[in-house]
Swiss-Prot record:
Cross-link Cyclopeptide (Leu-Leu), where in sequence: 5-64
Keywords: Antibiotic, Antimicrobial, Bacteriocin, Secreted
Role, per record: Cyclopeptide antibiotic that inhibits the growth of Gram-positive bacteria, but has no effect on the growth of Gram-negative bacteria.
Positions of the pro-segment in this chain: 1-4
GO BP, sorted A to Z: defense response to Gram-positive bacterium; killing of cells of another organism
Protein name in the entry: Carnocyclin-A
InterPro entries: Bacteriocin_AS48, Circ_bacteriocin
Temperature-related properties: Displays a high degree of stability when incubated at temperatures between -80 and 75 degrees Celsius for 60 minutes. Autoclaving the peptide at 121 degrees Celsius for 15 minutes had no effect but incubation at 100 degrees Celsius for 60 minutes caused a 32-fold reduction in activity.
Pfam families noted in UniProt: Bacteriocin_IId (PF09221)
Signal peptide limits: none
GO cellular component: extracellular region
Record flagged with keyword Repressor: no
Amino acid sequence: MLYELVAYGIAQGTAEKVVSLINAGLTVGSIISILGGVTVGLSGVFTAVKAAIAKQGIKKAIQL
């Protein structure tokens, strides 16, 4: 479950950055921007984990 959240968060954040890069045209900064997308994705993972904790209770979330 946790790995799925991580993969989803990274994919979503990276996809958003890739789309914006394609629209802006690929440059040397594109690599940095894609890495930024991974960071955004990880923050999305933390949000999802917080939601899981709130929804299922701390004990269940720790078992993830």
